[in-house]
Design a protein with these regions (language model features):
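Hydrophobic helix-cap positions at the C-terminus of alpha-helices
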Residues: 22, 216, 346-347
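Short glycine- and Lys/Arg-enriched binding-loop motifs that mark or flank ligand-binding interfaces
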Residues: 33, 193, 227-229, 249, ...
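Generic hydrophobic, helix-prone segments enriched in Leu/Val/Ile
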Residues: 119-123, 252, 274, 329, ...
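Conserved S-adenosyl-L-methionine
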Residues: 195-303, 308-317, 323-329, 337-338, ...
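A conserved structural/catalytic subdomain of Rossmann-like adenosyl-cofactor enzymes
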Residues: 2, 6, 288, 295-534
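Non-catalytic, mostly N-terminal accessory regions of nucleic-acid modification and defense proteins
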Residues: 1-213, 276-285, 387-390, 412-420, ...
């Protein structure tokens, strides 16, 4: 397959096939960093080579030709410094010709490749600009997982690079490559199973959440979007699909896991998000607040936090403005409301929309959580509650709920949608289709009662239910069974009895034809038949 004829689907497949080299050596949660890191390095390398060709007005048909052009001008003492300055100014990095992905693959092919060359390439990128600082720190090229000896490690990495060499990643820059990267992340999530929840939100859920956040504001310039538990950044980057001004969206994200944080940084760059429009932070959302410098409040807040995580719940947090207005702290064993209150705190007063996914327990659990829920309801903060189907996430089979929050609402009613049956059965998971998502969105826009699907509950109704938001209290999905006439039931019983009598007679007839091998056995058999007759 030529580089220029690769479709996005074949690009996806080729990327995933390159993982075969690593799949037998470690689980997906480990090898994702290696593969995604090398894809990213190839992208930076290829992009730079083609940029040099364009800058020097040299036509090149392949990466090999582009590398030859780069070498020629790099080695020209008269323009060497100027060339590097132009590259660095445009790219924020420059790669030595011998350390480009294309040059390294040439060495793979002639058997002279050394791991240290790739490691040096990684270091050079990391040291070139703050944007790339520590970006490859999770990729241990000398790990025993890659092979028991340095030679084996060298062979494994070389094999992956050889697979990746055929990919036209620079030609697919922007959303196509970004989407291919998303595809890889999704495949890793499928392979990783339970561990996947920390870095990936399934696309159907992300689609629903993002469309809700942007509803009526698709044309807004400079839309600010915040995810305090951003994982790989997939949820944030859905904005590019639903904003009509995608290049003006400004992304704010925080992630505790360093490996996942680096994944999000790569994801942003591969999606072509301008550097000035991405503000990502590697820290614990439930520790010190972030961001604390303007802007601190956002047009949209999207969150899929780890469910029922533990946190310190230190008494000092009662003085924290994120939590203090709500009377209690989320319990130590369940940080769900701590995440929710953090996101809500960072929501804009006017027209801000927060969409968060949490387990159903937050809707009805008592004690501290009941106090927080009551305070939110009395403030009118909770706008809509959507019950999602069970088993649609990678990390849990439990049903989850999407909660939509807004500030400065004029009333305190809550709209309930029971979408628990809106799915198709998949091989390992339930799947929400576009039709299911549209049905939910249509209901959300209308805010009308729909039989066995949606209900607009007044604040008085919620108070009557003691601030319990369990969806079945508001949306009755009970299906009455059709009453069967007694005459039909009696007829069925008679038919069943007749069938039993007929089959019993047939069995007795067959038993009567049996004979024991000895007189004693024959007598025992006859006694059994008589006992069976009753």
């Amino acid at each position: 397959m030529s580089e220029t004829t690769q479709t996005s689907q074949s690009l996806y497949q080729a990327l995933w096939n390159s993982a075969d080299v690593l799949r037998s050596k470690m689980d997906a949660n480990d090898y994702k960093s290696y593969l995604l890191g090398m894809v990213f390095y190839k992208y930076l390398s290829d992009k730079m080579l083609f940029f040099v060709s364009e800058t020097m007005e040299e036509e090149t048909e392949s990466l090999e030709e582009a590398l030859a052009v780069y070498r020629k001008y790099y080695e020209d003492e008269e323009i060497h410094e100027d060339l590097l300055a132009v590259i660095t100014d445009e790219m924020s990095y420059a790669i030595h010709p011998d350390l480009t992905f294309t040059a390294l693959v040439e060495r793979v092919n002639d058997g002279s490749f050394q791991l240290e060359d790739l490691a040096q390439g990684f270091r050079d990128i990391e040291q070139s600009d703050e944007l790339y600082e520590n970006l490859f720190e999770d990729i241990d090229l000398y790990s025993k997982k890659l092979g028991a000896t340095p030679q084996k490690q060298n062979q494994t990495v070389a094999a992956v690079m050889k697979e990746l060499a055929v990919l036209d990643v620079a030609g697919h820059a922007g959303d196509m490559l970004g989407d291919a990267y998303e595809y890889l992340i999704g495949q890793f999530a499928t392979d990783s199973g339970k561990k996947a929840g920390e870095f990936y939100t399934p696309q159907p859920v992300a689609k629903l959440m993002t469309q809700i956040a942007f509803l009526g504001r698709e044309d807004k310039q400079g839309f600010t979007l915040y995810d305090a538990t951003m994982g790989s950044g997939s949820l944030l980057l859905n904005a590019k699909r639903y904003s009509r001004q995608p290049q003006t969206v400004v992304y704010f994200g925080q992630e505790l896991n360093t490996s996942t944080y680096n994944l999000a940084r790569m994801n942003m760059i591969l999606h072509g998000v301008p550097i000035e429009n991405q503000f990502l932070h590697n820290a614990d959302t439930l520790d010190e607040d972030w961001p604390t410098q303007e802007p601190t409040n956002f047009d949209g807040v999207l969150m899929n936090p780890p469910y029922s995580a533990k946190w310190s719940a230190s008494s000092g947090f009662m003085d924290d403005p994120r939590f203090s207005p709500f009377g209690k702290l989320a319990p130590k064993s369940k940080a769900d409301f701590a995440f929710l209150l953090h996101g809500y705190y960072h929501l804009k007063q006017d027209n801000g929309v927060m969409v968060i996914v949490l387990p159903h327990g937050v809707l009805f659990r008592g004690n501290a959580e009941g106090t927080i829920r009551k305070a939110l309801l009395e403030e009118g903060a909770i706008d809509t509650v959507i019950g999602l189907p069970a088993n649609i996430f990678f990390n849990t089979s439990i049903p989850t709920t999407v909660i939509i929050l807004k500030k400065n609402r004029t009333n305190r009613d809550v709209y309930f949608i029971d979408a628990s049956k809106e799915f198709d059965k998949g091989k390992n998971q339930n799947i929400m289709t576009d039709a299911h998502i549209e049905k939910i969105l249509d209901a959300y826009k209308s805010r009308e009662d729909m039989d066995k699907f949606a209900h607009l509950a007044s604040f008085e109704e919620i108070v009557e239910n003691d601030y319990n938001l369990n969806i079945p209290r508001y949306v009755d999905t009970f299906e009455e069974e059709e009453v069967e006439p007694l005459t039909e039931i009696v007829a069925k019983i008679n038919q069943t009895n007749a069938t039993i009598e007929s089959q019993t007679a047939s069995l007795l007839d067959m038993l009567g034809q049996l004979h024991g091998a000895t007189p004693e056995a024959d007598e025992e058999l006859k006694a059994f038949v008589e006992a069976f007759k009753g």
